[in-house]
Design a protein with these regions (language model features):
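Short catalytic-loop micro-motif centered on adjacent basic/acidic residues
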Residues: 2-5, 128-130
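Predominantly a Rossmann-like dinucleotide-binding segment in NAD(P)-dependent oxidoreductases
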Residues: 3, 8-108, 235
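Glycine-/small-residue-rich active-site loops that bind phosphorylated ligands and cofactors
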Residues: 9, 134, 220
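Generic alpha-helical segment signature
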Residues: 10, 191-195
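Residues that form or flank phosphate/diphosphate-binding pockets in enzymes
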Residues: 12, 138, 213
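Contiguous beta-strand/loop segments that form the cofactor/metal-binding neighborhood of enzyme cores
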Residues: 50-54, 77-165, 195-209
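C-terminal helix-rich "cap/oligomerization" subdomain common to oxidoreductases
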Residues: 122, 164-168, 200-240
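C-terminal "lid/loop" region of Rossmann-like NAD(P)-dependent oxidoreductases
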Residues: 179-189
């Protein structure tokens, strides 16, 4: 029995959003965008990164850091792709803003601070997946918007458990012969608490039956990250 703790799946709103997309309620998915915003390089929400080792190592490849992509990119790529399906190809750009050679104590500050990416899914949908540690004004913000030909969904939160219990849904009506405008209203869907990854893992052990997200999913996301590094290095689209 195995499981990978993609912690933002603990959001009950996200789980229900995924069910809605997978059920086909918003129709064929054509476009999406996903963002993960942190600001601990521009604020002291989580401590002083210039003085504390627990933050400094995250900025140094020598100390094992894979930068923003490796730290929070793993979460946003799972968050973005789980409801839609497998990513077919991508084009990514990684950026380190600190000056070359910047160093604090033994930490060379050379890990990527920001990444942007364009993705295309096996079902033909396209979109963007981005993350940064320089998002001033956001502590730990996840955003996902998915657009289909029958509707759309979106979810935004800073904490998966306390704020992730809802998502937004819209089902645009086609323009009628009477000339009425399309309905562009969004409906808030409140969701009951759902199982966390930890609860699912304990249940999987009891039942001796694996559940998601498993090691295969973890390896799948890690492969996406590897392709992002490759794409950024060569400056081209790469197949997954």
């Amino acid at each position: 029995i195995n499981m990978v703790n993609f912690s933002y799946r603990n959001s009950s709103g996200y789980q229900e959003l995924c069910k809605m997309v997978k059920s086909g309620k918003i129709g064929n998915v054509f476009h999406m965008d996903a963002n993960y915003y942190q600001s601990w390089l521009t604020s002291n929400y989580w401590g002083n990164w210039k003085e504390e080792d627990k933050w400094l190592w995250r900025l140094s490849t020598k100390h094992g850091s894979k930068g923003t992509l490796g730290d929070i990119g793993v979460h946003i790529f799972d968050f973005a792709s789980f409801p839609i399906g497998k990513i077919k190809k991508l084009n990514a750009h990684l950026k380190t803003f600190k000056s070359k050679g910047d160093k604090i104590k033994d930490y060379v500050l050379d890990a990527n601070d920001t990444f942007i990416s364009m993705v295309e899914f096996e079902n033909g949908a396209i979109g963007t997946v981005n993350a940064t540690r320089f998002a001033t004004g956001y502590k730990n913000r996840l955003e996902l918007r998915i657009f289909g030909d029958k509707g759309a969904v979106k979810i935004e939160f800073d904490d998966a458990i306390t704020e992730g219990n809802k998502f937004m849904f819209t089902k645009d009506t086609q323009r009628q012969l009477s000339g009425k405008e399309d309905n562009l209203k969004w409906e808030e869907i409140q969701c009951e608490p759902s199982q966390t990854n930890f609860e699912k893992f304990i249940e999987a052990i009891k039942n001796n039956k694996n559940d998601e997200p498993d090691f295969y999913r973890g390896a799948e996301i890690q492969n996406i990250l590897d392709k992002c590094y490759e794409s950024s290095e060569i400056g081209k689209w790469v197949n997954i």
